[in-house]
Structures are given as structure tokens and as C-alpha cells.
Amino acid sequence: MLDYEWDNPSSIVLSGDERNPDSDPTRSSFSFFDPISHYNNDHRHITISPPLLSSFSNQQQQHHLTLYGQTNSNNQFLHHHHHHHSLYGSTTTTTPYGASDPIYHPHSSAPPASLFSYDQTGPGSGSGSSYNFLIPKTEVDFTSNRIGLNLGGRTYFSAADDDFVSRLYRRSRPGESGMANSLSTPRCQAEGCNADLSHAKHYHRRHKVCEFHSKASTVVAAGLSQRFCQQCSRFHLLSEFDNGKRSCRKRLADHNRRRRKCHQSASATQDTGTGKTTPKSPNDSGVKASSSPSSNAPPTISLECFRQRQFQTTASSSTSASSSSNSMFFSSG
């Protein structure tokens, strides 16, 4: 008895249009080949996208071309795909996969043509390619974006992208450029001067005063007669200066106070140093010098004591001799 494998229905593939395959007896008796149904059945169950299998799509294209001639994507056998919604137009592809894949469906409502551009760098861009990809311009721009270093609120690009950076950060209104240049250029704030300080020293550029007016005795600034203070680095009224001084009275007083404080502290240290050391007499110094140990010379104290004792003995002998002579004189008289 033959085994028909009724328990394995996975080997039988039926299309969606064949609701009742046993109702038509002609299909089992005749080997009639329907190109439209075969075309739809072949491609309804294939869900592989064409970009992944370009060689397979080319083989299917050649197979259908040999059977039916040039492939035609008319609407006569694709009317059952109207319910699909696509993002692309009918000019996106010429492969048979356009009938099965809703992304390449020819009857969908496509966006305006200005939002799309053809990508000719795909895998099928050669001589034997049978499809062209339609990629939105936003995606194309993402592929060609430049890589920059984002620090804070600004992105820094390489030197090769100077044109791109200039176009990115250029000002929208041309009038603002002249105003910005005039504000960024440092000029002297004295009335009637307005000297350009772009090439002056950093001190003059920072405080917006030229070298001449920074040393002048009288300068008209902000409608008042003033003088530039060397320590404050700003203009003051003439009443705040003493005679022809270039620094204001307040800053000079602070400067003098600091100088006096320095001198007082220095003199105080000198006084404390001299007060600790007491003056020494020459006898003390001689005694200390004599008391210092010396290996060669004998101590001087013993010699002096010896001399004093010898002087005392001689004095006592002389006094005894005189007393004896006196006694002899008085006795003889």
C-alpha cells in the first residue's frame, strides 16, 4: 500500500487565490501553465528583499524574460495589491519583485520627487543590474555628514571643511557684519581721538586708551576734564589727583601706607635683633679668651696668682725692714 504522507501538509504550498483546488478538475488532468498565476505564486511567498540577493533576482529576471519576453509591470494582473501602502513611486524598480514587495509597489502614492534621489552606488549599479534604489535625500545627507568635535554649544570641524563651516556659521543679515567689526575693533575713548588700537599694546587695547592720552595731564572724556590713573587704569576727575601726579590720591595713600608698613616692620625686626645682644666689656672678653682651652699655652690665671703672691711677699719684707729700721732709730735716740 502506498504511503501518501497525508500527515505532512507542509510540502504542499497553495496560493491565496486557490481557495478550493479540487473544484477545478482540469488542473489535475492537464499540465496547463498559467503565466499570471505562476508569476503571482512564485513571488507572493518570497519575502527576501532584492538588495540582499541581487544575483538571485538577476536569475529570476532572465528566467521570466526567456518565458514571456520583456517583463511588463502593467496594472492588469496587479490589481489585488491596491491595499498596500508604499513610500516610493512606480519608477523605483523594474524587477519582478516590485509586484510582491509593498515597498516597491507601483500603485502607491509616492511623495514629491524633490524628496528623493537615485542611489547609483548600490550593488546592482553595474551593467547587468535590473533595479535602482530610491533613497530619500535625508538619508543621503546622513551618509555624507562631516565628523566634528562638539565642545559645548559649538562643533569644530577639520581644516578641510572650511567652506562648510563658513556656510554653516555665516550671518543671515549682511548689515550685522559691519556692526560687529566696528564693535570688536578697540578704539580710544578720549573725545576727538577715536584711534584704532588693533595694533597697539595689550594694555591700551584692554583699557581702550591710546598711549598719548594715557600719559596726558588733561583729557576730555565723556564731556569732562579727566586724567588717566596709572594704577586704577581708568579716567578720574582732576580733583582726585595731587598736582601733577599720574595716580589718584586714594591709590597713592594706599601705596604709601604699604611702603610705611614695610619700613616699620623692617626697623622693628632690626630693633628686636639688637635688643637681645648685650654689649660685652673687654675684661669679659679677655677672660673668656683666656678661659678658652688651648693645648700649647698654660693657663694665665696661675701665673698672675703667682706674681701677685710674689709681690705680696716683697711688700711684706720691705715693710718689715722699714719697721725694724724705725725701731732702731727710735731706740738709738
Curated annotation (Swiss-Prot):
Pfam families: SBP (PF03110)
Region (Disordered): 1-28, 254-303, 314-333
Subcellular location(s) per record: Nucleus; Cytoplasm
Binding site for Zn(2+) 2: 229, 232, 236, 248
Principal location: nucleus
Amino acids binding Zn(2+) 1: 188, 193, 210, 213
ZnF (SBP-type) residues: 185-262
Chain intervals for the UniProt region annotation (Sufficient and necessary for DNA binding): 179-269
One CC-aspect GO term: nucleus
Basic and acidic residues bias locations: 16-25
Tissue specificity annotation: Expressed in shoot apical region and early floral tissues. Transcripts levels increase in developing pollen sacs, and decrease in later stage of anther development. Strongly expressed in the placental region of the carpels.
GO molecular function annotation: DNA binding; zinc ion binding
Superkingdom field: Eukaryota
Motif (Bipartite nuclear localization signal) on chain: 245-261
Keyword Cytoplasm: yes
Reported function: Trans-acting factor that binds specifically to the consensus nucleotide sequence 5'-TNCGTACAA-3'. Binds specifically to the 5'-GTAC-3' core sequence. Involved in development and floral organogenesis. Required for ovule differentiation, pollen production, filament elongation, seed formation and siliques elongation. Also seems to play a role in the formation of trichomes on sepals. May positively modulate gibberellin (GA) signaling in flower.
UniProt xrefs under PANTHER family: SQUAMOSA PROMOTER-BINDING-LIKE PROTEIN 4, SQUAMOSA PROMOTER-BINDING-LIKE PROTEIN 8
Protein name listed in UniProt: Squamosa promoter-binding-like protein 8
Organism: Arabidopsis thaliana
